[in-house]
Amino acid sequence: MSTEMEVVSVLKYLDNKSILVVGAAGFLANIFVEKILRVAPNVKKLYLLLRASKGKSATQRFNDEILKKDLFKVLKEKYGPNLNQLTSEKITIVDGDICLEDLGLQDFDLAHEMIHQVDAIVNLAATTKFDERYDVALGINTLGALNVLNFAKRCAKVKILVHVSTAYVCGEKSGLIMETPYRMGETLNGTTGLDINYEKKLVQEKLDQLRVIGAAPETITETMKDLGLRRAKMYGWPNTYVFTKAMGEMMVGTKRENLSLVLLRPSIITSTFKEPFPGWTEGIRTIDSLAVGYGKGKLTCFLCDLDAVSDVMPADMVVNSILVSMAAQAGKQEEIIYHVGSSLRNPMKNSKFPELAYRYFSIKPWTNKEGKVVKVGAIEILSSMRSFHRYMTIRYLIALKGLELVNIILCKLFEKEFQYFNKKINFIFRLVDLYQPYLFFYGIFDDSNTEKLRKMVSKTGVENEMFYFDPKVLDWDDYFLNTHVIGLLKYVF
C-alpha cells in the first residue's frame, strides 16, 4: 500500500462507473446497492448477478424479493414514482451462478457488454452456515471466488476486485491478529498437504460413491456436512464456513496477477447503525438468537467467557468500508487486506449481552402468542465448556438416562418421547460445538490498513459523514438497546 496519504472521493470515483455485484441477493449486497442508488445517482450501471429460482427468473427475484423490502423505503420516498425509471436505467439483472465457469452467463450479448463495460467487481456471495454441505461451501466460497476472479481478468476495464471474506478466517487464534494474506496451502495448525484441487476431487468422489449406492438425500446432506467439518478441523479451522472462505482468499490472492485486489474481512455484522435507517437487519446470528431467546423466556443461561471481547460491526459501516476501499485501491495493481471490526478501537466484552438483554426485556417485556407477558429474571452464566456440561448433566442428561431406563423396562413404551428428547439434546450439543470457538474467542483484529482508509476519506468533509465506518463513534448500550434489538424484533423474530 502506498505510504503517501491520499484523499479519496467515493462519489467522484462512482461517477459514470459500471459495477458488477456478485451475490446480489444477500444482506450486505442489498445495502450496498441501496446506498449507491441513494447517494450516487451518477453511477452508470449496476450489474446484479442473481440465480433464477424455482418458478422465478432472476429479474422476478429482484422485483419480488429484493426491491419490495423495507430497506428500500427511503429510496422510494426520495424518488417516488420515478424509482422504477431509476432502477431500469441503472440496474441490469444478470442471470448467472457463481459456482459455474464464466459465472454461468447464458446471454452472450450481455456477457460481451459486461466484459467491455464493467469497471469494478464486488464479490459478496457466500454461504455462511458453519456446517454447510462441503460441496456447497466449496463451490460458493472457494471455487466461486476463483470464478469471479477469472471473469474479472476477462474484463477490459476492470481496475478493482473487492472480495468480501470474514475476519474469522483466522480460526481460533488469540492475541492481535494482523491484516496478512494466506499463502496457497497454508494451514492454521501446521498440517501440510492442503490442496484445493484435491479437496474438489475428494468431494466429487464422495458424491459419486453416495449416488452409486443410492443414498437418500438426507444421507448425502449429512455426509457432506460431516466431511466439511472433518476437513476443516484437520487443517486447524473450526468449521466449514471459515475453512472454505480462507481457501477462497488463497485462490484470489495467489491468482490475481496484476489485478488490484481488496480482501475485506468484516467481523460479526449486525443491523444498520444509521443508513438508510437504524436497525435494518436480516437473518439470525448467534448473539441475536441468544438475546431474543432469553427475552421470550426460552433461554435461562448464557454460555460464554464474559471477559472476552466480542467484535461486531453494523452493516452500513461495512458497506461504507467496501465503497471507500474500492475507490482508494482501484488501479493500484496490489493486494491489500482490511479488517473491518471494533475489537481494537472500541472493544465490547461479552458481559454486555446478558446485561443489555436483561435491561431491554425488563423495560419492554415480550408478549407471547397467548397474550401473556414474559417476565425475565437473572440469567445463569456458564463461563466454560466444563460448566456447560455440568449444567446439561444435572438439568437434562440424568433425566434422559432415567427415561431411557424406564423405556427399556417397559418394552419401549416411551420410545417416541425418548427419541424426541435425545435428538433435541444432541442438537444442543452440536450447536454448542459449532459456536463454542466464538463464545470463547480471544483474538483482537488489528485494523491498521483500515484506519489509514478512514483517514483518506476523513479529509473530504461531506463524504466523511456519508461514508462513515469508525467504530469509535458507537455507544454500545445505546446501539443495542435503541437500535439493534428493536430491529431484530421488527424484521427477524
Swiss-Prot record:
SUPFAM superfamilies: NAD(P)-binding Rossmann-fold domains (SSF51735). Its EC number is 1.2.1.84. The keyword Oxidoreductase applies. Disruption phenotype: Glossy stem wax. Major decreases in primary alcohols and wax esters, and slightly elevated levels of aldehydes, alkanes, secondary alcohols, and ketones. It is found in: Endoplasmic reticulum. Keywords: Endoplasmic reticulum, Lipid biosynthesis, Lipid metabolism, NADP, Oxidoreductase. Signal peptide: none annotated. It catalyses: a long-chain fatty acyl-CoA + 2 NADPH + 2 H(+) = a long-chain primary fatty alcohol + 2 NADP(+) + CoA. It comes from the Eukaryota. Expressed in leaves, stems, flowers, siliques and roots. Detected in epidermal cells of leaves and stems, in trichomes and in the elongation zone of young roots. One of its GO terms (molecular function) is alcohol-forming very long-chain fatty acyl-CoA reductase activity. Its main location: endoplasmic reticulum. GO terms for cellular component: endoplasmic reticulum. InterPro entries: FAR (IPR026055), FAR_C (IPR033640), Far_NAD-bd (IPR013120), NAD(P)-bd_dom_sf (IPR036291). It holds the Pfam family NAD_binding_4. One of its GO terms (biological process) is wax biosynthetic process. Belongs to the fatty acyl-CoA reductase family. Catalyzes the reduction of fatty acyl-CoA to fatty alcohols. The preferred substrates are C24:0 and C26:0. May be unable to use saturated and monounsaturated C16 and C18 acyl-CoA as substrates. Involved in cuticular wax formation. This is Fatty acyl-CoA reductase 3.
